[in-house]
C-alpha cells in the first residue's frame, strides 16, 4: 500500500514537474520569440536608416558633381526649368482660354440682349399697328365725334392722331383733343368693351371717370377731381397717367420690373401683372383721400384678347362712375384756390408728368422761380436789414433801410440793388448816418440813388452775413480802380464827383465803406489791452517839425521821421479833440469786446485796406476814405512826394510802409465774423461818435482810420488796433536805411527805403513821462523840396505802459515808440 501510494505520489510529482518544465519552456519560447521580433525590427530600422543615408549620400554626390561640372549642370538645369516653364505656360494658357471663353459668352449675351430688345421694339411696333375689333359697338362709334373708335396715340406728342396705341407708357406728352371731347383712357374703353359696348365721349360718367385726363380745348377749362382742384405742380402734373410709370410686379411678387423697362410695352398688358398692379394701386388709394380715388385708381391696359376677361375692378365701376360724376359737378361749380402742392402722388418720374400736362402747368416754373428768388432774398437782405434796424437808435437810419429792403425785393440780381441815399454829405448833426449800422453804410454809399452796374461776382450780396463780417472779398472791387485813379480824381470832393467816376467807383466805394465800417469797429477806443488804455491824438498846428523826442528826463533821445503825404491836394485844416470822458466811457467796454475783436483781428491779411486810409481829413466821413485814398503805391511818384508836406490837416497816425504795401494782397473769405458781432460793435461805435461830436466842430467828424489793422506778422491781436493808433509812419528820404523785413513780408521789398531809421537804443521805459511827438521832416531837403510856407504839425500821443510794452514787443524792430501813462 505504501509503495503504491509512493508510486502515485512520484507519478504526480513527475507530472507536475513535466508540466512545470513545459510551461517554463513555453515561457522561454515566448520570451525568445518576442526578443527575436524586437531584434528583427531593430535590424529593419537600421537597414532603412542605412538605405536612407546611402540615398542621401548619392544625392549629395550628384549635387556636388553637378555643381563641379558646369556643362553638366547646365544640361541638367535646363530640363528642370523647361518643365517649370511648361507648367506655368500651361496654366496661363488655360486661364487665357477661360478668359476668352468668358468674353465670348459675354458678347453672346450682349447680342442676345440686343436681339431681345430688337424683338421687343418690333413687338411694340406691331402692337401699335393693331386695330381693335369694334363691330360690337359700331352704333356707338357712329355717334362719336371721333373718326374711329381707337385711342389717341400718346406717343406722338400733341399730334392728335388716332390709334389704339398700347404703348402709351412711353408717351411723353398729353395730346390735345380736336374738339370738346374727352380723352378717355384705354382702361375705360377696355372696361366698356368687357360690358359689350364702347363708352361715348360725351358720356358724363365717362368724363367723370377720366376727368384727370380730360382737356377741353374749346373752352380752355380742365375738369379735374375735387381733390385735385388746383393747377398741377411739377411734382404731380398728371398722377392719373402715371399708372404706367409704376414698377411692374409679378403675381408671385418675386419679379419686379423697374420703370422704364422694355417689358413695360408688353408686360403691362399681360394679365400676369394686372392683378398685382390693381391691388398695389388700391392699397395706395386706401391711404389717400376719398377724392383721390380717381387719380390713384388707374389700372393698366389689357390686350385685345383679355378685354373680355372679368376682373374685380369692374365691379366697382358703377359706384366709381357715380362718385366721379358728383366730383365733376362740384368741380365745375367752384375751384377753391390751393397751393401747388399735391396730396399724394404715385408718379415716380415727375419730369414725364410735366411733359404730359405741359399746357396745364405752364405757370409752375415761374412760380417756382419766384419762390426761389424770394427765399434766397429774404435770409440775405431782409434779415440783415431787420437786425440792423433793431440796433438803430435814430429814425433817420430806419427809413433808408426799409426803402432798401423794399427795393431789393423788386430789384434784379443782375444789376444789384437800388441804393437809397438819405445820408447827408457834409452835415454830421446826426451821428447815426455814419456810425450806427453797417447796412446804413452800404445803403447810402457815394452813388446817391444810383443803380450799381456791377455783377454779383464783382459786388457780392451786401446783405448776406458774409458781407458784414469782413471786407476781405470786397477788396477786389476797387484794386484796379485804385491803380487807374489819378490825382485829379482824388482831389475832387465827394459832392463834386463826376457821374462817370461815380459809376466806375460805385462798387468799390460801397465795398470800401463796408470795409471801413468794419475798420472802425475795432477802433482805438475799444482797447484790446488788458488795462483798457485809450490812445488819443491831438493836432497842434504852427509847430516846427524837426524836434527831438525825449522820454522822461534821463531817457535816450530818438529821432522819428514821418512819411510825407501821398497826394498834393489841399484839404481844410481840422482839429480833432477827444475828451477823457470818451476815453473812460469806452474803457469800460473794452474787456467785453476783446473776444470779438480778437476774432476780428485773427484774419490779419484781410485788413490791409485800413493802411491806405491813414491820412484822412476830419471833415470826410469814414465811408469816404476810399475816395480820398485810392492811389496805389505806384502812384506815389516823386512828383507827388514833392508837394506832399501839407501835414497840418492830415492824421499822421499810420502803419509802417511795408505794412501798407500789403494792401494789395489777395482778398480772403468773408465768413469769419458773424454780423451780429459787427452790429454790436457798430452800436458801440455809434455811442462813441455821439459823445465825440460834443467836442468837435459842426463840420468835423472824428475818424479812427487805424481802428482796423491787418498784417501777416505775429503781433498781438489784443493791441493791434491801438498799435496802429500810436505809431508814426516812416519817411521816404535817402536816410531811411532800415531795409530788413523782420516779419518776412516779401511784398514789402519794393518799399524797403521807406522804413524808419533804426535807433541804437530801445525805449522799454518803465517810468516814461508825457512826451510830445513831432513830425521830423528834413527841412530844406532837396529830394522833397520843402518850403517854409508849408504847415507844421506835431502829435501828442498818450498810451498806457502796458500797451507800449506790447507794441515794442512785436514792433521793436521797425520803430521806437515813446508813450506816456
From Swiss-Prot:
Residues spanning the membrane: none
Family statement drawn from the similarity comment of this UniProt entry: Belongs to the dapper family.
Residues covered by region (Disordered): 288-312, 386-432, 564-615, 627-655
Coiled coil: 88-136
Main subcellular location of this protein, as a coarse class: cytoplasm
Locations listed in the record: Cytoplasm
Polar residues: compositionally biased ranges: 401-432
Subunit structure: Interacts with dvl2.
Keyword Kinase assigned: no
One GO term describing the cellular component: cytoplasm
Listed Basic residues bias regions: 584-593, 601-615, 639-649
Protein name: Dapper homolog 1
Keywords of this entry: Coiled coil, Cytoplasm, Developmental protein, Wnt signaling pathway
Motif position, PDZ-binding: 818-821
Biased composition (Low complexity): 388-400
Domain writeup: The C-terminal PDZ-binding motif may mediate interaction with the PDZ domains of DSH (Dishevelled) family proteins.
InterPro entries linked to this entry: Dapper
Gene: dact1
Function recorded in the entry: Involved in regulation of intracellular signaling pathways during development. Specifically thought to play a role in canonical and/or non-canonical Wnt signaling pathways through interaction with DSH (Dishevelled) family proteins. Binds to dvl2 and may regulate the degradation of ctnnb1/beta-catenin, thereby modulating the transcriptional activation of target genes of the Wnt signaling pathway. Seems to activate the canonical Wnt signaling pathway.
GO BP field: negative regulation of canonical Wnt signaling pathway; negative regulation of JNK cascade; regulation of Wnt signaling pathway, planar cell polarity pathway; Wnt signaling pathway
